[in-house]
C-alpha cells in the first residue's frame, strides 16, 4: 500500500505552495488506494506556534484533504530521534563536533578565499578531544566517495557527487535533532513510499538518501514540484497577494475552486480547465507535473471560482452566505437568500462579492454615486417617484406581480418609457448595486422599506438640484 504525507512546519501561515504539495500527495494516495498522512515538523521550537498548527489543521479540513491516522508532532518524538543518534555514534555513523561558530566562520572564509565551496572540513570526523566550555553538535558521516542518484517523478534522474556534500549536523548543541535527520526517521516510521515536496528540498534529498542507506532503511521515491511564481516572475509571496489559505476562505472562494486551480499549476490534461475530484482521481499523474515554475494568476482563480459559484446548488450558497453578509453588517433570511442568490451566481466571483452586491436588500442607500445620480435623477424624476409612491401605497398585497402592475401603471399614466421611471427607482432602492428585476427588488425589501427609500431619494433630489 502506498503511503504519502504532508509535513508542514508551523512557523507561519499555510500558503498556496504548501497546499498544492498536500493536494498532489493526497491525490496520489487516493488514486493508489493508499493512505495520506499529516506530520507537523515543529522541531524549530522558537518559531513554531500553536496558532500556525491550527491554521494547517483547519485549512486541510476546509479543503477536504482528509488524512489517515493520528497527526505526528516531531517535537514529541525527541527521545526517539536521540536514541537513534546515540546508536549511530556508537556504530561510527555519526560523531561529536566541538567546532565553535567562530571556527566555522574562519573555515568558510578561508575556503572562499581559495575559491572553494564553503563547507565543514571534517575536523572531528575521525575523533578529537572535547573542548572545554563547548557543547558539541553531532554530525553524520557522509560518504566521501561515489554518487547519490534517484529517479525523481518530476525532474527525472538526479545525480549528486558525494564530494559535493559535507558532514551535516543531525543534532544541534541544544540537544534538538535537525530537520534533515528527523524527516528520515519519521518517513521510515510512517512507511512513506513517495515523498512529494517543493523543489527547494532537492538539495536535502542526497543527504537524506545517504542517511536512509546508513541506517539500513528503504529509500522512498521522490517528486520535487516546482515553485509557484507571481505575475512578475518572482517567487510567490505576500506582495503578490499570497496569503494564509484560510484567507481565501474568508474572501469567499470555494474549496473546490482552490483545489481545481492549484492542481492546474504545473499539470494539465488537454485543454480541460474544470475538474471534479472524481476526474482528478482519474486523470492526474505526478509524473506529468511540469518541472518549470508555474505562475499564480489571481484573476484566473477568480474566474474559476465564478464558474463554481454558477454551478453550486442555491441551498448550499444560502448556507454559506450568512457569515459573509454579517461581515458586511447585515443579515438576510434564508427565504430572501434563496430568492436573490440565483440573480448573482453569474455576476459575483466570490461569496464576499456576492454579499456586497446583495447588501441593498437589507440596507437602504445612505447616498448615491454621483455619476449614477446625475444620469438617473432628472428635473421631473421627483414627480414620477411621487406617483410611484402613491401607486405602491394603494397595494393591499405587496408582491412581485402587484408591484409589476403598479410600475406599469405609472409608465402608462405618464406616457413615458419604462427606463425614465425604472432607472431612478432602481437607484433609489439599491443605491446603484447590481440587482435583479425591479419588481422583485421591491418585493424583496417589502412595502414599508420601499416607500421609505423612494421618499429618501426624493429628498436627496430636492437637496441636490
Swiss-Prot record:
SUPFAM superfamilies: An anticodon-binding domain of class I aminoacyl-tRNA synthetases, Nucleotidylyl transferase. HAMAP family: Glu_tRNA_synth_type1. A motif ('HIGH' region) lies at residues 8-18. It comes from Dichelobacter nodosus (strain VCS1703A). A motif ('KMSKS' region) lies at residues 235-239. GO terms for cellular component: cytosol. PROSITE patterns: AA_TRNA_LIGASE_I. Belongs to the class-I aminoacyl-tRNA synthetase family. Glutamate--tRNA ligase type 1 subfamily. It comes from the Bacteria. Keywords: Aminoacyl-tRNA synthetase, ATP-binding, Cytoplasm, Ligase, Nucleotide-binding, Protein biosynthesis. GO terms for molecular function: ATP binding; glutamate-tRNA ligase activity; tRNA binding; zinc ion binding. It catalyses: tRNA(Glu) + L-glutamate + ATP = L-glutamyl-tRNA(Glu) + AMP + diphosphate. This is Glutamate--tRNA ligase. It is found in: Cytoplasm. It is an enzyme of class 6 (ligase). Its main location: cytoplasm. Pfam families: Anticodon_2, tRNA-synt_1c. The lineage of its organism: Bacteria, Pseudomonadati, Pseudomonadota, Gammaproteobacteria, Cardiobacteriales. Its EC number is 6.1.1.17. Catalyzes the attachment of glutamate to tRNA(Glu) in a two-step reaction: glutamate is first activated by ATP to form Glu-AMP and then transferred to the acceptor end of tRNA(Glu). PANTHER family: GLUTAMATE--TRNA LIGASE, GLUTAMATE--TRNA LIGASE, MITOCHONDRIAL-RELATED. One of its GO terms (biological process) is glutamyl-tRNA aminoacylation. Monomer. The gene is gltX. NCBIfam families: gltX_bact. ATP binds at residue 238.
Amino acid at each position: 500500500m502506498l503511503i504519502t504525507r504532508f509535513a508542514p512546519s508551523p512557523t507561519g501561515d499555510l500558503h498556496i505552495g504548501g497546499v498544492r504539495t498536500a493536494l498532489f500527495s493526497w491525490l496520489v494516495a487516493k488514486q493508489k488506494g493508499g493512505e495520506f498522512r499529516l506530520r507537523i515538523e515543529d522541531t524549530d521550537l522558537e518559531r513554531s506556534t500553536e496558532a500556525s498548527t491550527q491554521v494547517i489543521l483547519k485549512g486541510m479540513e476546509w479543503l477536504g484533504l482528509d488524512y489517515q491516522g493520528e497527526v505526528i508532532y516531531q517535537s514529541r518524538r525527541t527521545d526517539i530521534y536521540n536514541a537513534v543518534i546515540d546508536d549511530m555514534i556508537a556504530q561510527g555513523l555519526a560523531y561529536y563536533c566541538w567546532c565553535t561558530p567562530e571556527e566555522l566562520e574562519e573555515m568558510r572564509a578561508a575556503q572562499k578565499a581559495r575559491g572553494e565551496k564553503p563547507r565543514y572540513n571534517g575536523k572531528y570526523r575521525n575523533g578529537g578531544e572535547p573542548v572545554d566550555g563547548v557543547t558539541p553538535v553531532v554530525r553524520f558521516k557522509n560518504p566521501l566517495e561515489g554518487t547519490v542518484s534517484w529517479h525523481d517523478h518530476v525532474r527525472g534522474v538526479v545525480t549528486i557527487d558525494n564530494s559535493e556534500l559535507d558532514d551535516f549536523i543531525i543534532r544541534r548543541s541544544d540537544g534538538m535533532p535537525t530537520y534533515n535527520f528527523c524527516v528520515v526517521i519519521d518517513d521510515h516510521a510512517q512507511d512513506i513510499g513517495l515523498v512529494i515536496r517543493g523543489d527547494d528540498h532537492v538539495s536535502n534529498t542526497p543527504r537524506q538518501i545517504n542517511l536512509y542507506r546508513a541506517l539500513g532503511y528503504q529509500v522512498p521515491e521522490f517528486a520535487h514540484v516546482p515553485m509557484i511564481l507571481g505575475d512578475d516572475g518572482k517567487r510567490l509571496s505576500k506582495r503578490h497577494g499570497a496569503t494564509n489559505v484560510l484567507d481565501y476562505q474568508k474572501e469567499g472562494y470555494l474549496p473546490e475552486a482552490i483545489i481545481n486551480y492549484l492542481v492546474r499549476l504545473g499539470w494539465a490534461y488537454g485543454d480541460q480547465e474544470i475538474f471534479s475530484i472524481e476526474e482528478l482521481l482519474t486523470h492526474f499523474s505526478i509524473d506529468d507535473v511540469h518541472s518549470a515554475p508555474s505562475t499564480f494568476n489571481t484573476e484566473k482563480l477568480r474566474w474559476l471560482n465564478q464558474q463554481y459559484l454558477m454551478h453550486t446548488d442555491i441551498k448550499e450558497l444560502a448556507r454559506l452566505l450568512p457569515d459573509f453578509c454579517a461581515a458586511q453588517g447585515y443579515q438576510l433570511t434564508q427565504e430572501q437568500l434563496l430568492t436573490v442568490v440565483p440573480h448573482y451566481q453569474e455576476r459575483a466571483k466570490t461569496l464576499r462579492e456576492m454579499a456586497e452586491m446583495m447588501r441593498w436588500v437589507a440596507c437602504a442607500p445612505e447616498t448615491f454615486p454621483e455619476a449614477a445620480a446625475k444620469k438617473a435623477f432628472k428635473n421631473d424624476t421627483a414627480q414620477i417617484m411621487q406617483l410611484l409612491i402613491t401607486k405602491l401605497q394603494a397595494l393591499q398585497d405587496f408582491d412581485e406581480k402587484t408591484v409589476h402592475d403598479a410600475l406599469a401603471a405609472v409608465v402608462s399614466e405618464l406616457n413615458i418609457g419604462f427606463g425614465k421611471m425604472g432607472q431612478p427607482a432602481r437607484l433609489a432602492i439599491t443605491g446603484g448595486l447590481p440587482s435583479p428585476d425591479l419588481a422583485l427588488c421591491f418585493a424583496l425589501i417589502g412595502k414599508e422599506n420601499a416607500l421609505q427609500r423612494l421618499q429618501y431619494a426624493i429628498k436627496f433630489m430636492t437637496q441636490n438640484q
